[in-house]
Amino acid sequence: MINYFKKYFKNSPTKQAFLQKNLIPFDLGKMIRVGNNKDGGYVVSENGIKSCEFLLSIGLGFHFSFEKDFLKLKKSDSLLIESYDNSVSKKIMREYSTQNLIRLFFRPSFKTFQRSIRYFEFLLLFNSSKAIHVEKNVSEKKSENSETLNSIFQYLKQNNLVKIDIEGGEYILIYDIINNFNKINILIIEFHNLSNLENREKLDFFFEKVSEYFYLSHLHMNNSNGVSVDNFPDTIEFTFEKKCLLKTNVKKKLVNFPLDKLDYPSSKSTGDYNLIFK
């Protein structure tokens, strides 16, 4: 069983059995990392990402290495990426890079240099015909500054990779995600604020639904937010891949995490969390 969940569920055999059954990933063949070796990179199966023709990215922030790598993997001149995030724009990116450029003169570092050119990377990515950034959030209700997931999926075709990292906003999208399983090949999603018991119940509910149609291929504890007082990780990253696209004799993968040369700590200031399955 997983060391980080033992303590919380030691008096609940039903939940412990559920987690033991579902949180052990399946062996879907060769796994690759898409994105950088820190926060913003995720692990998927090589065969799974080949099946994806389009990336719907919900939550961008200042890290878009995943989106850049997705473009490199796809050889097409058509639109490949649509990203939603109201917290970033060309203006915000320009100000962010300018501040770091000034800082670079006084306290030079490679990290500051990387941040100083982020605006130009943003322009290169989203000024092309292959990727667009929509300055709206994705929520349960449509408004001037937000779009609904259902309305986005209405015009999307099949074979999509959906990546969701919206700092706790994922919970209000759970039902919309479930309603559109048929258009998703791979779902990468971060669940935040799991120190909140209500959020853990929502995660349990989602797992029951997603496990009907998808295999869990990977999970990783985001070490940026630590663990709660009962030793439960506050943020977990999940990769789910559609069952019908894969061979039928898929088995659980009894390996320990993090995976060497695939998993990296989200924050370099502290060590990565271990998941012990064997």
Task: Kindly label every feature range from the protein language model.
Residues 52-56, 66-80, 92-95, 151-278:
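Conserved acidic-Pro-Pro-aromatic motif
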Residues 9-10, 22, 105-111, 154, ...:
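Short, flexible coil/linker elements and helix-boundary hinge sites characteristic
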